[in-house]
C-alpha cells in the first residue's frame, strides 16, 4: 500500500502544490523501520510544518478467523494495516481502503484543518494583544 498507493498519491499532490502554488513540499520514505512509513511535509516559514504520515501497524489475527472456512483469504496470524499520523500528535486512522484520489483528498482535508488551526491561533493572539493594548 505504501509503495503502490500512498507514495504515488503524495508525489502527485506534491508536484501540483509545488508547481501551481510554490509550496515547499518534501516526501520522505522510511521503509527500513520496524513500522515502515511515508511522510508528506509542507514547510512553513517560522511556523510548525504540516506533516501527514502513513505507517504500517502490525496486528494479530484471531486463530478463529484463520480457521474459518468462510474466510479462505485469511491465512496468516499477523496482518499489516496502514494508519495515518500527524504533525500535532493526533491519533490516526486506517486508510487501507482508500485509493490514490481519496488519499489526496484526505491529505488536502488535513492540510485545510492545519491552516484553519493556524488562522484560529493567529486570531486568538491578535485579540489577546489588542486587549493588552486597550488596558
Give the residues covered by each predicted segment.
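Sparse, context-dependent recognition of short Cys/His-centered cofactor- or disulfide-binding micro-motifs
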Residues: 10, 25, 88, 92
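Intrinsic disorder/low-complexity polar-acidic segments
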Residues: 35-135
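Contiguous, amphipathic alpha-helical segments that mediate oligomerization or scaffolding
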Residues: 1-24
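Charge-dense, helix-prone N-terminal extensions
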Residues: 27-30
Amino acid at each position: 500500500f505504501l509503495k503502490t498507493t500512498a507514495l504515488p498519491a503524495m508525489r502527485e499532490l506534491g508536484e501540483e502544490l509545488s508547481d501551481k502554488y510554490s509550496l515547499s513540499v518534501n516526501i520522505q520514505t522510511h521503509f527500513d523501520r520496524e513500522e515502515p512509513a511515508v511522510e508528506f511535509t509542507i514547510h512553513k516559514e517560522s511556523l510548525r510544518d504540516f506533516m501527514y504520515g502513513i505507517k504500517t501497524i502490525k496486528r494479530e489475527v484471531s486463530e478463529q478467523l484463520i480457521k474459518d472456512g468462510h474466510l479462505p483469504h485469511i491465512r496468516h496470524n499477523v496482518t499489516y494495516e496502514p494508519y495515518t499520523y500527524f504533525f500535532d500528535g493526533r491519533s490516526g486512522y486506517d486508510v487501507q481502503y482508500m485509493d490514490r484520489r481519496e488519499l489526496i483528498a484526505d491529505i488536502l482535508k488535513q492540510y485545510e484543518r492545519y491552516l484553519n488551526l493556524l488562522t484560529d491561533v493567529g486570531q486568538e493572539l491578535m485579540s489577546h494583544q489588542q486587549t493588552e493594548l486597550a488596558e
